[in-house]
Amino acid sequence: GQGIISIAATIGMASLKNNLFFKQAEVHGMSQRGGAVQSHFRLSDKEIASDLIPMGAADIILSVEPMESLRYLPFLSETGWLVTNTRPFVNIPNYPELAEIIKEIEKHPNHIALDADQIAQEIGAARSSNIVMLGAASPFIQIPFECLEDGIRKIFGAKGEDVVNANLKALHAGKQFSDSKK
């Protein structure tokens, strides 16, 4: 629903172009009923044995929902980057105050927090907030940006040129946001 699988597929496509090894695992936590979808994505220039990321070993947590970003923080390495959307997906009673969640996110020294939904709407690509998030994470992914663009073209190509262009625009908008914050 929120595009985590499309993000992972795009990175996977981009990593193939760079002759990198990758393994991906998805966990669908009752996603049909509003639960979280989590995707572990490991990328390396060497062979990878396991598709799951050990606690404290992730270089990036890319989250399309702010509270979910905090849930997976134990996976992040000390030097890793937390890249998260600030627009909540309120699907539970007693959702915590957004200001408190943002305060917790800001405690992490390496973080990028953006309202990807608003950015996607502003650029006329309202359904591409997930790709705005991928663009925001792109400076921290060890793959050339052009390869992510090619991944977008391959993943969304069958949906037509308008969809591809909207997602490319979203990718660029997210990268531009992160570049302005570094």
Language-model features: locations:
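Active-site cofactor/cluster-binding pocket
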Residues: 1-182
